[in-house]
């Protein structure tokens, strides 16, 4: 299981997501307020993740402590309304 900090942030915000893992890299896809988001982990000499959580229409690579950075952004979002 990879991207555990990110998964915990999504659970805290009650955001439903799909998790898959391939070649040792985690992948998360989810919707929030009608927009599709992704977090796709990679290992290319360094570990990182491609994501669009900072801007729904634009992907960017995050390296270093990418799980902390991405989960921090998700936790800053408003809570989901009940029933959403």
Residue ranges and their predicted role:
Residues 13-47:
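Amphipathic, interaction-prone secondary-structure segments
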Residues 35-68, 72:
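Intrinsically disordered, low-complexity regulatory segments enriched in Ser/Thr/Pro
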